[in-house]
Swiss-Prot record:
Family affiliation: Belongs to the glycosyltransferase 28 family. MurG subfamily.
Source organism of the structure: Brucella suis biovar 1 (strain 1330)
Cystines in this chain: none
Name by which UniProt lists this protein: UDP-N-acetylglucosamine--N-acetylmuramyl-(pentapeptide) pyrophosphoryl-undecaprenol N-acetylglucosamine transferase
Function: Cell wall formation. Catalyzes the transfer of a GlcNAc subunit on undecaprenyl-pyrophosphoryl-MurNAc-pentapeptide (lipid intermediate I) to form undecaprenyl-pyrophosphoryl-MurNAc-(pentapeptide)GlcNAc (lipid intermediate II).
Ribosomal protein found in the keyword field: no
SUPFAM superfamilies assigned to the protein according to its UniProt record, in alphabetical order: UDP-Glycosyltransferase/glycogen phosphorylase (SSF53756)
GO cellular component, one term: plasma membrane
GO MF annotation, one: UDP-N-acetyl-D-glucosamine:N-acetylmuramoyl-L-alanyl-D-glutamyl-meso-2,6-diaminopimelyl-D-alanyl-D-alanine-diphosphoundecaprenol 4-beta-N-acetylglucosaminlytransferase activity
Catalysed reactions, semicolon-separated: di-trans,octa-cis-undecaprenyl diphospho-N-acetyl-alpha-D-muramoyl-L-alanyl-D-glutamyl-meso-2,6-diaminopimeloyl-D-alanyl-D-alanine + UDP-N-acetyl-alpha-D-glucosamine = di-trans,octa-cis-undecaprenyl diphospho-[N-acetyl-alpha-D-glucosaminyl-(1->4)]-N-acetyl-alpha-D-muramoyl-L-alanyl-D-glutamyl-meso-2,6-diaminopimeloyl-D-alanyl-D-alanine + UDP + H(+)
Database matches in NCBIfam families: murG
PANTHER family: GLYCOSYLTRANSFERASE (PTHR21015:SF22), UDP-N-ACETYLGLUCOSAMINE--N-ACETYLMURAMYL-(PENTAPEPTIDE) PYROPHOSPHORYL-UNDECAPRENOL N-ACETYLGLUCOSAMINE TRANSFERASE 1 (PTHR21015)
Record pathway: Cell wall biogenesis; peptidoglycan biosynthesis
InterPro entries: GlcNAc_MurG (IPR006009), Glyco_trans_28_C (IPR007235), GlycoTrans_28_N (IPR004276)
Length: 379
């Protein structure tokens, strides 16, 4: 890593969940290959996701989430953000970065505000079809905005927005080389259930209940991989054991891209990283947007894939165990439909997003405007 890092330092700032950190990791991999020394500024939640960064290149910045209107809580929040600003300034004085790139989440506010106030070029990447609150607060200050699913040429900041897609990690690109092979009607059917990096309690209850309603000969075909929150792991595993269905249940899978490539069908939330990985690998999916998202970003992400014919989208409120069982049974017995969905999903994937985002980052470092970058990248 260090013998290549002759271009200078770039700091990536990301909230401590997989949805923010996975695209940051993908960009880091691309930038390192180009000779950049890449550091990560994040929060304490990030420890299980930051294996791609050397320990001395991970910097925990004090931060807090702005929520509610309680004056005392708000005062504590703004105090934490101010301390994070001081942390960031101290870090940047030492590292002297040529660029700071934000990937969303409130922990990006202190580093991006500090960088812009210090005259360091800044760039934010918005993974979702609807801009998150932290990025909204930064959009007016940064040099450029990169979008994953943002609508093209619309919004107040269209002039400085470039649609790059969402960078995916190298293991996703490896998994993308595995072609989709539909299961025959009597073959084993590999189902992947994925709630995003933080899991989904709803799936831990609803999927076993739906599987219990399947005819016995259909249950006998199932091989399930399911991500579940730690508090739901044992109950989900026991439910499948009682039904006689082989199931690998865990809070987190380090090899999720390979498991996705191995799946015949995916049931998932529709966070931006999840949808991006589904499209790059090319797998048929049922997407159930998280219903309590503040900006309904997951619904917008899911709609983008559904419009291409790559997924079915179902509201959680409409998904009874009975309906879920019917949809699962239909998927298991319509291999041609799933094959078409897989092709449609892959057709909208952007496997070169990390390259394009790195190109934009280097353009901003060199002093180019977004307009100059766009003109130089026209087909």
């Amino acid at each position: 890593m260090d013998n290549l890092a002759n271009q200078g330092v770039i700091v990536l700032a990301a909230g401590g969940t997989g949805g923010h950190l996975f695209p940051a990791e993908a960009l880091a991999h691309e930038l390192r290959a180009r000779g950049w020394d890449v550091h990560l500024a994040t929060d304490a939640r990030a420890q299980r996701f930051v294996g791609a960064f050397a320990q001395d290149h991970v910097h925990v910045i004090r931060s807090a989430t702005i929520a509610g209107r309680n004056p005392v809580a708000l005062l504590k929040t703004f105090w934490s953000l101010w301390q994070g600003n001081l942390d960031s300034r101290k870090l940047f004085r030492r590292l002297k970065p040529k660029l700071v790139v934000g990937f969303g989440g409130y922990p990006t506010l202190p580093p991006l505000y500090a960088a812009s106030n210090m005259g360091i070029p800044t760039l934010i990447h918005e993974q979702n079809a609807v801009m998150g609150r932290a990025n909204k607060g930064l959009a007016g200050r940064v040099k450029a905005i990169a979008g994953g699913f943002l609508p093209e040429n619309s919004g107040a900041y269209a002039a400085k927005t470039v649609i790059t897609g969402n960078p995916v990690r190298p293991p996703v690109l490896v998994a993308a080389a595995t072609p989709y092979t539909p299961a025959g009607k009597d073959d084993r059917f590999r189902l992947l259930v994925f709630g995003g990096s933080q899991g989904a309690q709803f799936f831990s209850q609803a999927i076993p209940a739906a599987v219990a309603l399947l005819p016995e000969h259909e249950r006998a075909r199932l091989l399930i991989t399911q991500q579940a929150r730690k508090e739901d792991e044992a109950s989900a595993r026991q439910a499948y054991e009682k039904l006689g269905v082989p199931a690998d249940v865990a809070p987190f899978f380090n090899d999720m891209p390979a498991r996705m490539a191995d799946a015949h069908f995916v049931i998932a939330r529709s966070g931006a990283s999840t949808v991006s990985e589904i499209t790059v690998i090319g797998r048929p999916a049922m997407l159930v947007p998280f219903p309590h998202a503040l900006d309904h970003d997951q619904a917008a992400n899911a709609a983008a894939l559904a419009a291409a014919g790559g997924a079915e989208v179902v509201r959680q409120a409409d998904l009874s165990p009975q309906r879920l069982a019917e949809m699962l049974q239909s998927a298991m017995n319509e291999p041609e439909r799933l094959e078409q969905q897989a092709k449609a999903a892959k057709s909208v994937g952007k496997p070169d997003a990390a390259r394009l985002l790195a190109d934009l980052a280097e353009a901003i470092v060199s002093g180019k405007t977004v307009q100059e970058f766009k003109e130089g990248n026209r087909p």
